Every structure is written in structure tokens, then in C-alpha cells.
Amino acid sequence: MEKTEIKNGSEIYDTVRELLCLFGADSVQTVEFTDSSHGDLDIRHNYLIDRKYVLRINSAPVMTDGRLEELNRLIERYREFGMHAPKFLKAKDGRFIVERDGNICYLSEYLDETVADDVKDGCLEELRTQRRIFIARFAEKYRNVDLTETVSMYSIFDLSPYDKLDGLEIDEKHDNFNHLTADLQKAGEYALAERLVQENESIRRELRSFYKELPRCVFQGDENFSNLCVDENRRISGLFDFNMSGTEVIANYLANAALNFFYTDEIMQSRSADEIYRMLTKAYAESTELIRKYYNFTPQEFRAYRLYSKIAMYSAYWNTSAFSEYLAQEQCAEKVVRLLWKIAEEDFRA
């Protein structure tokens, strides 16, 4: 995201300095602003102060004192695990939240380290491997530790805070899936859409019968390379941005972490649907083999992992968006349809 420098003497600069004083920090030299808002009803303003603090001003009431307290406990676990992670700081009155003009304001430390996204060229696959190992090891160590009522964005069935904020009555993957089947129907692929609906309902019905019995863990929830830091050897060394954090069924979280196939123009234009399906399942099998070296699934968990994996294959956002994008391209549409038929019909095994 693009940063904008806030000039000393401006109204915003004075507001930032005033708010910072409430947290016991009086000195302000430089302020950089980034806007990660999701429309006018979901304002997310971020102010980087002296490369030491981040002041966030949000309109959505997702963050509360209780939520930030539980996030600090999670951050402490990541630190114990060997990762650098910035904690949230309390104001002088002992609370994390300061209210201003109908918005909530809160402060955290700033992790002034190299972001993986800036150095991933040349080591992308190595970083992806490190990320899967890191997540699997964390899940193994902190299985069922200090679980929270807040669920992660990966959640199936239970709604995350941002699902609720968006007005959804279904989980995000179900919403993604509905968009995909709607696009298939618009393209005249009614039989395929119906077959996918049948498969999705069957898998979800099976999962619903036992998912509440499965081990869980609280995760950071958004380990993309813009939220991960690396050391001088390009080893993952820290993480930040805990907005999406929450409790998740470990089998589901790992099924999403295992996604390691990306639909590109080169692949979609030069490969057949059968070849793409083989590439997809091979990549997933390799990820699964790696994850199993660091996380010990129970038989019931691995049964769930296989079911969650298939849901991720056709309902994870980056997959559904790719399917819809290439479905709209005449030269790729038939290939997407055949690929989705294979995903629906094949007895996929992660």
C-alpha cells in the first residue's frame, strides 16, 4: 500500500500527536499514512509514527479491549515460538481502545524489519515451504491452547467477525462458492454448477457431523508475504497484522496452508485440463507430505483434512476468482469447465 507523509502542522498530524499522548508517548517526528479501508462504511486508517508505533483508526467495532487482550496473549505465544511480533499498547487509563469521533483508535509496536513480499523474488518456493512448516509446527505446539470465541477467516460453518461485518449469513468460502456457481450458470453450465453444489453439500454435511470434536489452535490468520518478516538469510523471522486472528480447526487451517498451485496465464493457455488437474493434485500431495512431517494428525483429523482440502480446492478465494476470470476468456472457458468437472467428480485425496 502506498504511504503518504503527514506534514507537521496539519490537522491530521496534530490529531495523531494528541492521540499518541493518551498512550503516554509525547514525541512525534514523522508520520506516514496508509489507507486500507474497505469502502466508506469500513474505514481503516493506519499511521506509522517514527517507525516505532502504528496508530490504527477504524470505524468498525471489531476490535475491543477484550479482543486486543486475547491478541496480546497470542502474540506472546508467537514470541515464545521464536517469532518477532509487535504487541498492542495500553493507554494511560489502562485500556487499549481510545474513542474519537465515532471511531476506535488503538496503538501497537512497529516491527521494523524486512517484509518477505519485498525480497521474495528468487526465493519464492523456499519461502512458501518455510511458511507451511512454520504453520504446522505452531499448530503442533499450541494445539487446543487458550482458545478464543473469535474464529478465523478460514472458518467453515462458524462466522468470523469480518463475515458478520460484511452482513454474511454464511462463511466466506460458501460465499465464494456461490459466486462461482452463479458465474457458471451465467455461462450456461447449469449441470456443472448443480454437480458442484451436490458435492459441496455432501462434504459439508459430513464435516458438520464431527468438526466440533476436532483439535483447534489460535492462528495469526493471514500469513501472506506482506505480513511476514525475514532475516538477512531470508528466513521467516516475524509476523504482524493480527486483524484476522482467531481460533480454527487445525485440519482446516492446514488444508488451506497446503494450497500451493496457482493458476497463471501460461498454465491456462498451454496446458490441457487433465494436465492442470494432475499438476494441482501433485502440488497438494507434496504440501500434505511436508505438513505431515511437522504435524501429527489423528485419523479423524486427517479424514477432516481431506474433506477441507477439497472445499479449499474450489472455494478458496484465489481459486474461485481464477476460475471465474478464465471462464470469462473464450480461449480458456472450455478448459475451466472440464477442470471443474474433474474436481467435482474425482475422488480427490490430499
Residue spans for each PLM region:
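Conserved NTP-binding catalytic cores of kinases and kinase-like/nucleotidyltransferase enzymes
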Residues: 1-96, 231-232
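An alpha-helical support segment within catalytic cores of ATP-dependent transferases
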Residues: 16, 20, 172-221
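Active-site acidic catalytic loop and adjacent metal/ATP-binding pocket
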Residues: 39-51, 55, 202-252
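ATP-binding pocket architecture of kinase catalytic cores
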Residues: 51-150
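A cross-family kinase active-site recognition segment
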Residues: 125-188
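Active-site activation/catalytic loop segments of kinase-like enzymes and analogous catalytic loops
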Residues: 251-294, 309-327
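Alpha-helical scaffolds flanking conserved acidic
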Residues: 299-313
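ATP/Mg2+ or Mg2+-diphosphate-binding catalytic cores
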Residues: 311-350
